[in-house]
């Protein structure tokens, strides 16, 4: 089980990303629009830099829904390999069959 503080921190980051998503997207569009004057684009970059760092989507860490483990994460299942194997062995994941040869 992951530390609760790490899981909670990740939840706070997700909340911030959602809160600032529209503003960040608008500023990025202005900053990357080459038809605008250089000064205006630079202003947009400065405003973008003033936003909280944790409002960037790249700061979100994918974590297992079951244990909170940050590594070996399967995006499709939203869980780590350890949880997948454990739940699969107990037959709790539909369609997952243990291989044997």
UniProtKB/Swiss-Prot annotation:
Pfam families, A to Z: Ribosomal_S14
GO cellular component: cytoplasm; small ribosomal subunit
InterPro entries: Ribosomal_uS14 (IPR001209), Ribosomal_uS14_bac/plastid (IPR023036), Ribosomal_uS14_CS (IPR018271)
Gene3D superfamilies, per database record: 1.10.287.1480
Biological process according to GO: translation
UniProt-listed PROSITE patterns: RIBOSOMAL_S14
One Gene Ontology term of the molecular function aspect: structural constituent of ribosome
Superkingdom assignment: Bacteria
Stored HAMAP family: Ribosomal_uS14_1
Family under the similarity heading: Belongs to the universal ribosomal protein uS14 family.
Role: Binds 16S rRNA, required for the assembly of 30S particles and may also be responsible for determining the conformation of the 16S rRNA at the A site.
NCBIfam families, per database record: PRK08881.1
PANTHER family listed in its UniProt record: 30S RIBOSOMAL PROTEIN S14 (PTHR19836), SMALL RIBOSOMAL SUBUNIT PROTEIN US14M (PTHR19836:SF19)
Subunit note: Part of the 30S ribosomal subunit. Contacts proteins S3 and S10.
Protein name per UniProt: Small ribosomal subunit protein uS14
Organism name: Phenylobacterium zucineum (strain HLK1)
Gene: rpsN
């Amino acid at each position: 089980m992951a530390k609760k503080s790490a899981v909670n921190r990740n939840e706070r980051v997700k909340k911030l990303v959602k809160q600032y998503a529209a503003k960040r997207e608008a500023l990025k569009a202005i900053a990357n629009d080459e038809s605008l004057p250089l000064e205006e684009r630079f202003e947009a970059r400065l405003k973008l830099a003033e936003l909280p760092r944790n409002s960037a989507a790249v700061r979100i860490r994918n974590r297992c829904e079951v244990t909170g483990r940050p590594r070996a994460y399967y995006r499709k299942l939203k869980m780590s390999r350890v949880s997948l194997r454990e739940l699969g062995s107990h037959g709790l994941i539909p369609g997952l069959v243990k291989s044997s040869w």
